[in-house]
Regions:
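Short proline/glycine-enriched turn/loop motifs at strand-loop junctions of beta-rich domains
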Residues: 42-49, 56-58, 549-552
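C-terminal beta-strand-rich structural cap/linker in extracellular carbohydrate-active enzymes
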Residues: 80-84, 571-605
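Short, acidic/polar linear motifs in exposed loop/turn regions
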Residues: 45-47, 150, 537-540
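Catalytic cores of secreted or luminal carbohydrate-active enzymes
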Residues: 475-496
Length: 605
């Protein structure tokens, strides 16, 4: 059956080729039409293209080519559930490929593309209507890997874990779940960061409708969903995007630019159709799956050639990132765009400058590295590393930072968080409570990887479930309870989030006492004021003094040595001081304490 409806799409296709489109998924791939599907594939340099699948009895059907716009097309009596493949012919070479715009595919075996039902009906209107970028709201992100959060054998479906995940997230007072990539990928140990299907939900976790339902159910329970997407590179498998039309269609032809350090292939954003392809991918996931945020992986490898600052800024990529973020911000103004960027490139979260990349948030890798380094050092030598704690606030207001303790820090012999702490078994738990208090009360939004909340002693392994049984040990159960309560205090007190990016929201009270490694600071918002005291050394203080020039009452809200967390400080303190008096606190070794600061009339009320 010959249908020539494609002629009506030429303006859209021209926009796509020129890099101006974010709706490529509505133009290419399998498009429903009458009782079947139209298949369109952009491959300008291919000599011929064939399609075969369940609907052709796996016989080759030749596709027509529009030579002016460089795409192939065909109508087939295909239906939902049919698998298919493309055969691309160039200079006599016949190569089977997956459809770049396939919505699903087989991740193993014969890597065929799959036609799926795309008419899922969401029930999350209220949540989507009220969501925001959370600049002045609490955002405490729980990062998970679908396949190993709770593993039931070889493969885990989204819907296998969703009910238990919701219970855990709500109980722990997290606000969002961030999901490591679920775009289709062939090599499981890549964790999804080397993809072959930029519009396909990985079949190892279910079909697209399963993921949509997963997001929908989370939204109905008040939980936001952020997805990791990869824009810097794609998998090196021959059947994916690699030399798709017999030429370097998606990648650079120049030696030194094609391959990344991981052996994957870098996207070439000097090409208009590549820009449109990736903008369309981002738009597809946001629009079709109701995502609340996208975390863009390895941004530093886009900013600089293969992430090497000595090779200079990659101007084509800079322009693309800025264009991508402007496009998405206009189409989806309440969806967050988050950069995982380890570079010192400026203006990552700036939307006004020509050089600004336009992200909403940037991971603070400097804070993460400095903090971990500090806690790895022996307590008695920490005075020499004092600036590892103080330095973050020197640059914090340059960007809109998010504080991550992510999967990258607990894998490949880097050790789990508990084993990064210096000292013996007992003192590691004490220090990890201090570190988490520091993270949750420091300005900036928060992220923790699954397992951090129970102080697991295991490095993360994508082939194994988190060892939840460890909570049967009192010390881990106590730690988990502390994290839950700490998260609750963060979530319910505006001082800890409303003014994250306003310099008036933070003030050091004790910042220069390197000899004792005691730090103290206030967090403030309208009608909300707190004092955070952190003893980061194995040193007891019978009466550590803080000068205040006000009549105040200090009401302790959480202390890491409370008996409910395995400690022996029985009563939370309430201390009243008059103007000119000092606040005097007993501080135990590795103690974290958070006080609400009230004036007398506030206490009375």
């Amino acid at each position: 059956m010959q249908i020539n409806i494609i002629e009506t799409d030429h303006e859209q296709i021209e926009n796509y080729i020129n890099g101006h489109a974010s709706n490529g998924h509505e133009i290419f791939g399998p498009i429903p039409y009458e009782d079947g599907y139209i298949f369109r594939v952009y491959a300008p340099n291919a000599d011929q293209m064939f399609i075969k699948g369940d609907f052709t009895n796996w016989e080759n059907h030749q596709m027509s080519k529009n030579p002016e716009y460089g795409y192939f097309y065909i109508y087939e009596n295909a239906k939902i559930g049919d698998f298919y493949k493309l055969i691309v012919v160039k200079d006599g070479n016949w190569v089977e490929h997956t459809d770049p715009f396939a919505r699903a595919m087989d991740h193993e075996g014969d890597f065929a593309s799959l036609i799926v039902d795309e008419n899922y009906n969401f029930n999350d209107d209220e949540f989507v209507k009220n969501r925001s970028k959370n600049f002045d709201k609490p955002m405490n992100i729980y990062e998970i890997h679908i396949g190993s959060w709770l593993r039931y054998g070889q493969n885990v479906n989204f819907l296998d874990i969703v009910d238990k995940l919701i219970v855990h997230v709500k109980e722990m007072n997290y606000t969002h779940v961030e999901i490591m990539p679920v775009t289709e990928y062939p090599f499981y140990p890549s964790w999804g960061y080397q993809s072959t299907g930029f519009f396909a939900t990985s079949s190892r976790y279910g079909r697209p409708d399963d993921f949509k339902k997963f997001v929908d159910i989370l939204h109905q329970n008040g939980i936001g969903v952020i997805l990791d997407l990869v824009a810097v590179h794609f998998a090196n498998d021959y059947y994916g995007l690699k030399t798709f039309d017999g030429t370097h269609l998606y990648e650079s032809p120049y030696e030194g630019l094609t391959y990344s350090e991981w052996g994957s292939i870098n996207f070439d954003y000097s090409k208009g159709h590549v820009r449109s392809f990736m903008k369309s991918s981002f738009a597809y996931w946001i629009e079709k799956f109701h995502l609340d945020g996208i975390r863009v992986d390895a941004v530093s490898y886009m900013i600089y050639y293969n992430g090497n600052e000595n090779r200079g800024v990659h101007e084509d990529n800079i322009k693309f990132i800025s264009d991508l973020n402007k496009t998405l911000a206009k189409k989806y103004p309440n969806v967050m765009l988050i950069a995982e960027d380890s570079s010192s490139y400026p203006l990552v979260t700036n939307k006004n400058s020509d050089q600004g990349l336009g992200f909403d948030y940037k991971w603070d890798m400097g804070w993460m590295n400095d903090t971990i380094k500090y806690f790895e050092v022996d307590s008695f030598n920490r005075s020499m590393y004092h600036n590892k704690i103080t330095f973050s606030m020197f640059y914090f207001y340059n960007e809109r930072f998010l504080l991550p303790l992510s999967h990258d820090e607990v894998v490949h012999l880097k050790k789990p968080m508990i084993n990064k702490m210096n000292g013996d078994y007992e003192n590691r738990f004490k220090q990890l409570k201090v570190l988490n208090t520091y993270q949750m009360t420091h300005p900036g939004k928060k992220l923790n990887f699954m397992g951090n909340e129970i102080a697991t002693f295991d490095e993360w392994n994508e082939n194994e479930s988190i060892n939840w049984d460890i909570k049967n040990y009192p010390v881990h159960d106590d730690f988990n309870r502390f994290i839950k309560d700490l998260n609750c205090i963060y979530k319910n007190n505006s001082a800890f989030f409303a003014n994250d990016y306003d310099e008036n929201g933070f003030e050091w009270i004790i910042v220069d006492d390197a000899n004792t490694s005691v730090f103290a600071y206030e967090r403030r918002a309208e009608n909300s004021r707190f004092l955070v005291v952190l003893n980061m050394a194995n040193m007891y203080h019978g009466g550590y003094e803080f000068a205040y020039d006000e009549d105040l009452i200090f009401v302790e809200k959480i202390n890491s040595f409370n008996p409910k967390y395995g400690g022996a400080k029985n009563d939370y303190r309430e201390i009243e001081i008059r103007k000119g008096e000092v606040l005097r606190l007993e501080l135990w070794e590795y103690e974290a304490a958070v006080f609400e600061i009230l004036k007398k009339d506030e206490k009375t009320n």
